[in-house]
Swiss-Prot record:
GO terms for biological process: gluconeogenesis; glycolytic process. It catalyses: (2R)-3-phosphoglycerate + ATP = (2R)-3-phospho-glyceroyl phosphate + ADP. Pathway: Carbohydrate degradation; glycolysis; pyruvate from D-glyceraldehyde 3-phosphate: step 2/5. The gene is pgk. GO terms for cellular component: cytosol. It comes from the Bacteria. This is Phosphoglycerate kinase. One of its GO terms (molecular function) is ATP binding. PANTHER family: PHOSPHOGLYCERATE KINASE, PHOSPHOGLYCERATE KINASE 1, CHLOROPLASTIC-RELATED. It comes from Thioalkalivibrio sulfidiphilus (strain HL-EbGR7). Substrate binds at residues 21-23, 36, 59-62, 113, 146. It holds the Pfam family PGK. ATP binds at residues 197, 319, 345-348.
Amino acid sequence: MSVIKMTDLDLAGKRVLIREDLNVPVKDGKVTSDARIRASLPTIEHAMKAGAKVMLMSHLGRPEEGVFSEEDSLKPVAEHLSGLLGKEVRLVRDYLDGVDVADGEVVLLENVRFNKGEKKNEEGLSRKYAALCDVYVMDAFGTAHRAQASTHGAGQYAPVACAGPLLAAELEALGKALDNPKRPLVAIVGGSKVSTKLTVLESLSKVVDQLIVGGGIANTFIAAQGHPVGKSLYEADLVDEAKRLMAAAKAKGGDIPVPTDVVTGKEFSESTPASTKRVSEVAADDMIFDVGPDTAASYADMLRKAGTIVWNGPVGVFEFDQFAAGTKALGEAIADSDGFSIAGGGDTLAAIDKYGLASRISYISTGGGAFLEFLEGKKLPAVAMLEERAKG
């Protein structure tokens, strides 16, 4: 995909408006997890060192649109960013009619969702954003699947629109994993419901060699093979869909392997005892909470031999230690693999953190919904806009 890259432009003395994803958790006026802020630092520092007049924009939380609220203010983010950059980052509340910024200075524009028309990508607001800058930089992959004024419209009307380093790296990693993957390509899709991931399963099953399903999704596939699932979370109305996906994968030489053994409990709680059994032996009052050791070993073997791995979702209730072994084994196999690995989605990132795997995974995606939509084969509006603008 061809987009203009920020790193290829001369930014000296230019007004540069960067849309970042600084939507971080804040408690008592302090940022509690700054991963997204840190991820955006190389972009900000590049523009700053190039002598640009840097304006950052982001959303935070879900305020009522057009209404200022203290709890969704980016003030804590500006303070945190000042600490990380070692220089003051001014928070600007009223900026739609213009902002004074010095060369090399960084200012943070207040929450874009305080502006009426942001979510609907209104032309009037988009043009006001665009008028603030000489160069618009889209760097927020996490919101690239939404066509909003700050992620899409601003770029349509700005003199120049380009991709920031974070977004460019994200698109490159996803392209490497899906457009021209080194085979075998193995994907893991976990999560509680087939219905929410159906399009992803559908789309991936056409391109991968093996599609490992986990969590509640796997239970529906277990049921589709005629095995009992007891009181486990599964979707009876999607059993035929699961059968169809398995048959379609097989027909094109791929495979959706189904667990042969599972770890069950009697209730969803941290203290419920775990027991391991063959998948055919699940009792009527059992709930499946993880894949068993044989299944985990066979999946881990597939992953270690993979040329490319896409990981979205845990395979068990890893928050409870007695049901965490499957996710841990798969995570470690991915980390040990010589293949190219990309992981994304909130629960997946939590598992990577829990087992300290981050440094051994090739690329960790910052986007949840955007990552999924990319896997579904959808065109992300912000990316489509950047491609359009690159054509001139």
